[in-house]
């Protein structure tokens, strides 16, 4: 299997379906025949009500879960067909940021960042990479801080640095500002935009917040696991129309 299953080219979902059992002999489709193409370098927002399938779609794209049917293809390689080493290699090209930071409380900010680093890197190069990323996310000088000594916004910055430690070509962010106040949320969004500008990576962000969605290049609205809107925002799409559409979450 090719080793270039990365999102340096288009990310293509074709009729992707994922169902979960909610009771005996009863299933619900969290992703329902989703077909979607995300171009390399795009900043796309997935919106929809709670339970609309945003998180499930991110998990399927990141190969955390497998679809029941349909395919996910990255850079021309079918991710859903990968196993073993090639699958692990693909997962390393994907960074995840979640609403909850999931930092290890006994580790410093630096050690949290470098925890996922590939084992073949030397300890020195790992720590250099960690310091570089902490500086990039605005936490220079906080390398030895424990999570308990950091604000929510600072902890989310550490989580973003950790997600970037293996230089992913795709960043999947699941409600990354959900636990933050408005000031910290705005700073995190600005940080993501800057990091994307520097690296050219693709970002897919799940959010129910219209103001956040309006910052993206692309709006994909989900309802009951299906795509109901797919709008290009890069050409100056009116923010008020984004807000109206995201407001139609039901």
Report residues per predicted region.
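ABC family nucleotide-binding domain
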Residues: 9-11, 15-215, 222
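Pre-NBD coupling/linker segments of ABC/ABC-like ATPases
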Residues: 1-5
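Conserved beta-strand-loop-alpha-helix hinge in the C-terminal portion
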Residues: 226-250
